[in-house]
UniProtKB/Swiss-Prot annotation:
Note: Plants silencing NAR2.1 have decreased nitrate uptake in roots under both high and low nitrate conditions.
Stimuli inducing this protein: Circadian-regulation with a peak in the middle of the morning. Induced by nitrate and sucrose in roots. Down-regulated by asparagine and aspartate in roots.
Signal peptide (from-to): 1-27
Principal subcellular localisation of the protein: membrane
Gene Ontology molecular-function annotations: nitrate transmembrane transporter activity
Residue ranges crossing the lipid bilayer per the database entry: 180-200
Subunit structure: Heterotetramer composed of two NRT2.1, NRT2.2 or NRT2.3 and two NAR2.1. Interacts with NRT2.1, NRT2.2 and isoform 1 of NRT2.3.
Official protein name in the record: High-affinity nitrate transporter-activating protein 2.1
Family listed: Belongs to the NAR2 family.
Lipid bilayer topology: Single-pass membrane protein
Tissue and organ expression note: Expressed in epidermal cells of primary and lateral roots, root-shoot junction zone, vascular tissues of adventitious root primordia, stems and coleoptiles of germinating seeds.
Keyword Membrane listed: yes
Stated role: Acts as a dual component transporter with NTR2.1, NRT2.2 and NRT2.3. Required for high-affinity nitrate transport. Involved in the regulation of NRT2.1, NRT2.2 and NRT2.3 expression, and in both, HATS (high-affinity transport system) and LATS (low-affinity transport system) activities in plant roots. Imports nitrate with high affinity when expressed with NTR2.1, NTR2.2 or NTR2.3 in a heterologous system (Xenopus oocytes).
Organism in which the protein naturally occurs: Oryza sativa subsp. japonica
Amino acid sequence: MARLAGVAALSLVLVLLGAGVPRPAAAAAAKTQVFLSKLPKALVVGVSPKHGEVVHAGENTVTVTWSLNTSEPAGADAAFKSVKVKLCYAPASRTDRGWRKASDDLHKDKACQFKVTVQPYAAGAGRFDYVVARDIPTASYFVRAYAVDASGTEVAYGQSSPDAAFDVAGITGIHASLKVAAGVFSTFSIAALAFFFVVEKRKKDK
């Protein structure tokens, strides 16, 4: 009986302690919901590729620049702590592809899936040279930059024109070095088969 009472007391203590611990779900729910349409377009964003220009994943570099729009009032960037830059599918590359669907709710948006960089915000202008990642698929893209406050919440944005998108040629097929290795292996296999064929033939002749 005493043992059961001890177990019950321990369970009660654990329940009381657990009541004061924030649950992961509650913490996630506390994350600020942000809508693109509610954000001021306070950043001017530029990219080096011209409209329709093709850059190759894993090889070419895209230069991204951003600055505060000159039409913004003084102090408009007071809350800006960092700039988060993303590569986004252009409208033409989202058609009939639900997994690339754009959403006004940034937490549900699938158009801007690829991180380019996160940089501390500096008054004036910023720049980053992005080597296109090897896993970027073939598609048309534009670049979007978010100004982020101290809490990590997006408070403003800017983007290159989706209608002036550039194209990325993704890595497809077999890499050249793999082709060479496969060729060497095939040659070795044929030579080995020929050798064993000759050996077996000589054994039979004897």
